[in-house]
Amino acid sequence: MRVKIICSLLCRPVFPEISTRNILFQIFVDTPSNIGKTYTATSGKSFTVSKIDNFEYIDPIDKSVTKNQGIRIFFEDGSRIVMRLSGTGSSGATVRMYVDTYESERANQFKSAAEMLAPCIDVALQISQLPKFTGRNEPTVIT
């Protein structure tokens, strides 16, 4: 079963007004050594990077392509993280983070989204270094 954070407690953490010069997303994407790298959450659960890309949006109507929409980090267990910058405020952009994770243990599939996604979110914060760049340990909005 795939647990997605689309409309649940930890759906979409939002970190507004980020200085874009501090965002190291592209460096992460452009570093091939990140493929195969294992990150361990504070809970002890490990995630090994299987693929990283900078995704694009293809309009379903006119088929126009908008490149560099954000990064996707895929893990060997089927979990993934999507991070993208959106908009610009007077002091920077907003980082939107989407996380989904795969859980094969049936007993765990009935736990709360917050509990199930916490390890993957922990790893997303390690990779993005958002607490370092923003001075915040949690997002201002969770949808």
Identify the function of each model-found stretch.
Residues 1-101, 105-106, 110-118, 122, ...:
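Phosphate-binding and adjacent anionic-ligand microenvironments
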